Amino acid sequence: GENQCVGFVASLIDDSFAPGGERLLEPVAELLGELICAPITERGRFVPAYFDSEKQNLLDAIRSLINDKRDYADSRLLREMCAGEAYGVPRLGTEETAERLQPKRLYAWYQELISTARLELFYSGSAPQRRVEQALLAALSSLPRDQVREIALHQPHPARAEVLRVEEALDVTQGKLGMGFACGSDDYAAMMLGNTLFGGSSNS
């Protein structure tokens, strides 16, 4: 939807498979909490060398999107259909916005993010619920939670009076056609099934 989601994921083997039955949940949760709550910084900003490396990775990912013509066509469709709306912003952003990123400004934004964003925790494994709760609560105990904002609800934009057609010529062997419909239907499940039937998934 209109909201940006940021995720942190840790994978670990079950204690029963660890040598000597070592308990792994707690140290892994602690590491995850440290990465989220206390990332490495330098003079109130992300470390420039690490920042520059990740910035280049982001730019490379944005530029390589055109190599997957289906994903590129989907991205162009949303940018044109939802121009001026948050939903029209590409998932990775644009080259222009990525180029403007700076370590100090990004760190300030990150601090705002972890202070105001809603937090959801998911665990899949065999550890008892109480143990998982204790491990995660301890790991995230320093996470500021007193300024959490409610998620804003957005109404879909109304359908255009006239069909918008956009063409882009590329050196490809197979063209891609994307069609977007602003329907605003409350019957979301049926709409998604219809999208799948018309070729909206790998199972179509």
Residue ranges of model-derived segments:
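Short, conserved charged micro-motifs
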Residues: 17-25, 129-134, 187-190
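Acidic/histidine-enriched alpha-helical segments
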Residues: 38-62, 150-158
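A common structural junction motif
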Residues: 30-42, 138-147
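Non-catalytic, conformational "gating/processing" segments within enzyme and secreted inhibitor domains
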Residues: 103-139
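M16 family metallopeptidases and their MPP-like homologs
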Residues: 1-38, 57, 61, 70-96, ...
